[in-house]
């Protein structure tokens, strides 16, 4: 059949049915007349319905029923298991190692939801009151309360204020299918869709499942969704501990979650049917007062929660101890308040268990007067100050360059560097002359530290720091220069604490743990047990630090503890990091925006916090000195020319001396002083090239050593030759009698 033929047949069909429709009123009228006459004559026996009319009526009924069924069809609803599985709290929670809630973080901002509350975790009185208030025949009907529906219809016809007829099942269906509860969805069709959805829900869910879902999905106040969030936010309770009055007030919120306290009190009174309802007015005002917050977590570790809590509903158990966390917060807050006039606004505290590496306290800041309260002070990179010196001296002792009794000259020194002349000074701008390494480290003297760095080498020391967990040192040693000994590099408090912990563990380093499920990595050795032990003993010596800090500073504790302070340039940062046999504690005080403090050093800023935390940690079991490892000998020593008082000192076996007069030979090993590594020298175009020379200078005992320039032997190092090198990059090496390179520099001539 052609397309035209099909179209013609369709038109003929349409005309026939159009005529039948047009004739229908007259035919129907005639039929009704005949039926009426038959009824008058014979009653029901005389009524005869023509088959065609009967078919039409049945057709109309079927079409109408199908249309009704279609337009009132409910949306597809998930089953109970799917709703439970798809439930995501708006929060994530942080717990300490003992299961105590220490913080939470808001992840989802659409609503405030807690974890799904099981029906058995809601107090029985609260369950009964919610049913009585919202659907008192809930246990009896099959999804639609016909009595309530009839009453609501009668009230509407009589012009009365309509009562609610939506059952719990209908409300749950509306929560699961939001289009059932759209604004304006109050027509007959919408109500019928809700009814059919409720029937479908009742056919697949149990009554307890429907009630449980309602208690979790219902909105109570503001953005609080579910009885868990409402109980915690409005009463500070769990659903299991809700009393009768609590439940009455919560049920009074359900019809209008934003109702004023007076309206809530009146509705609670009506639900209670008590004669004396005066208590509800005050309870409602207190419950809904502006001071009530929906976030009642302790808020003990906001910076750590911001870092760890990224997934809604997450429950992370940290290594923290809530009691130690509180003690650290209290100590830091008290100190910052005391420094109010010194422009010190920020601080951070880390406490670590030495053996496990578990972080027991993590305080990234306390807010207060901070201008950057969201910034984590424990993870921020700041200048280290003098806190890197212990690792420098440990390296010197380990390599045999010096001992704890070696004499270092604390006197003015000028060092040529690629960026100019470097002149280190002490904190108090004074110099003490010859001092032992013990006094120099414990007293945090700067010039002796720089002289020690000359022994170890900048690159080697930078590499040692990197191995000890200081991951912010991404440049080579030449970038930091001699100031690396004095803490020009930037470090974090977490890195500091972990590095000092390695000294407490005899030179073994491993990453710290923040969560209980984190893997424990095997430690690696960064220095020898002997060097670590000797440095720890130097840091724990109150007599050695007395010349700089006094005999009764904040660093002195009634038990054994090794400690070091540090202050960065212009007093922008100060540190105090130390350890006992069981704990390592680190404190940073400063300003996260980088502006300087006013006359605040490590001993006056960070040290009091460190002391308070250490006293709290060691109250029951005071810190004890670690046992001396093998390979260390103790000797009675005396110093020449009365440099220091006689004392007993510790040495690596084979390095001990009875009388200390000069630094050991290793401390005077030769170094290339000029040219300076990394320097760029330019030829003067106005001076004949043959007349331009570059002087070489070597310090220390260089007898028998030779200089090698780009594999060319320049002769013995004591000749101080002048060289003319062509433009380009050059390598100058100093080698000993065995041909071993003891020092080298790279420089450029243009």
Report residues per predicted region.
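Active-site loop and adjoining helix of the penicillin-binding protein/serine DD-peptidase-beta-lactamase fold
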Residues: 198, 202, 254-271, 312-324, ...
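Non-catalytic, structured segments within soluble enzyme domains
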Residues: 64-68, 161, 165-326, 330, ...
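Flexible, acidic/glycine-enriched loop-and-adjacent beta/alpha segments
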Residues: 86-87, 118-168, 225-235, 242-247
């Amino acid at each position: 059949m052609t397309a035209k033929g099909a179209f013609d047949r369709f038109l003929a069909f349409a005309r026939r049915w159009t005529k039948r429709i047009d004739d229908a009123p007259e035919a129907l009228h005639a039929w009704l007349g005949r039926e009426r006459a038959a009824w008058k004559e014979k009653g029901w026996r005389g009524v005869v319905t023509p088959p065609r009319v009967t078919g039409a009526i049945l057709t109309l009924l079927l079409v109408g029923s199908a249309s009704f069924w279609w337009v009132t069809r409910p949306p597809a609803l998930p089953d109970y298991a799917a709703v439970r599985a798809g439930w995501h709290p708006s929060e994530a929670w942080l717990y300490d190692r003992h299961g105590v809630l220490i913080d939470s973080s808001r992840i989802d901002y659409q609503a405030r939801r807690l974890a799904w509350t099981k029906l058995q975790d809601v107090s029985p009185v609260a369950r009964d009151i919610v049913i009585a208030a919202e659907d008192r025949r809930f246990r009896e009907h099959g999804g639609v309360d016909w009595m309530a529906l009839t009453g609501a219809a009668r009230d509407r016809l009589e012009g009365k204020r309509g009562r609610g007829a939506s059952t719990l099942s209908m409300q749950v269906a509306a929560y699961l299918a939001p289009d059932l509860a759209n604004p304006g969805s109050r027509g007959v069709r919408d109500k019928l869709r809700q009814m059919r959805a409720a029937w479908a829900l009742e056919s697949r869910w149990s009554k307890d499942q429907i009630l449980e879902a309602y208690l979790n999905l219902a909105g109570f106040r503001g953005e609080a969704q579910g009885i868990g969030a409402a109980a915690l936010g409005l009463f500070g309770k769990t659903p299991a501990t809700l009393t009768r009055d609590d439940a009455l007030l919560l049920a009074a919120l359900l019809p209008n979650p934003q109702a004023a306290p007076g309206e809530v009190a009146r509705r609670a009174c009506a639900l209670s049917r008590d004669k004396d309802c005066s208590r509800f007015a005050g309870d409602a005002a207190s419950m809904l007062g502006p001071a009530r917050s929906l976030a009642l977590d302790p808020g003990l570790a906001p910076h750590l929660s911001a870092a760890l809590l990224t997934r809604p509903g997450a429950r992370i158990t940290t290594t923290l101890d809530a009691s130690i966390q509180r003690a650290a917060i209290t100590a830091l807050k008290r100190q910052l308040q005391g420094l109010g006039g010194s422009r010190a606004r920020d601080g951070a505290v880390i406490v670590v268990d030495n053996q496990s590496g578990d972080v027991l306290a993590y305080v990234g800041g306390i807010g207060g007067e901070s201008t950057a309260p969201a910034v984590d002070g424990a993870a921020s990179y700041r200048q280290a100050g003098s806190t890197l010196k212990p690792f420098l001296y440990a390296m010197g002792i380990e390599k045999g360059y010096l001992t704890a009794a070696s004499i270092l000259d604390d006197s003015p020194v000028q060092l040529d560097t690629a960026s100019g002349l470097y002149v280190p000074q002490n904190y108090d701008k004074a110099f003490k002359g010859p001092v032992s390494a013990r006094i120099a480290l414990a007293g945090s003297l700067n010039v002796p530290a720089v002289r020690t760095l000359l022994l170890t080498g900048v690159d080697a020391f930078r590499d040692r720091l990197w191995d000890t967990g200081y991951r912010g040192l991404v440049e080579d040693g030449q970038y930091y220069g001699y100031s690396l000994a004095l803490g020009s590099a930037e470090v974090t408090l977490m890195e500091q604490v972990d590095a000092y912990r390695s000294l407490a563990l005899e030179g073994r380093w491993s990453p710290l743990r923040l969560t209980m499920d984190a893997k424990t990595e095997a430690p690696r050795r960064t220095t020898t047990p002997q060097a670590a032990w000797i440095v720890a003993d130097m840091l724990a010596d109150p007599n050695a630090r007395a010349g700089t800090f006094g005999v009764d500073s904040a660093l002195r504790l009634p038990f054994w503890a090794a400690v070091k302070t540090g202050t960065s340039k212009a007093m922008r940062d100060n540190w105090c990091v130390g350890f006992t046999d069981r704990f390592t504690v680190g404190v940073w005080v400063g300003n996260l925006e980088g502006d300087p403090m006013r006359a605040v050093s490590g001993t006056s800023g960070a040290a009091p916090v460190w002391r308070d935390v250490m006293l709290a940690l060691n109250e029951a079991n005071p810190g004890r000195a670690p046992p001396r490892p093998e390979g260390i000998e103790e000797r009675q020593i005396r110093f020449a020319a009365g440099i220091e008082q006689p004392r007993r000192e510790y040495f690596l076996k084979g390095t001990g001396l009875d009388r200390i007069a000069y630094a050991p030979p290793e401390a005077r090993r030769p170094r290339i002083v000029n040219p300076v590594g990394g320097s760029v020298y330019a030829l003067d175009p106005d001076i004949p090239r043959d007349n331009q020379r570059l002087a070489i200078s070597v310090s220390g005992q260089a007898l028998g050593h030779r200089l090698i320039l780009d594999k060319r032997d320049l002769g013995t190092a004591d000749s101080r030759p002048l060289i003319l090198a062509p433009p380009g990059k050059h390598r100058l090496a100093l080698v000993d009698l065995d041909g071993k390179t003891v020092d080298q520099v790279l420089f450029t001539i243009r």
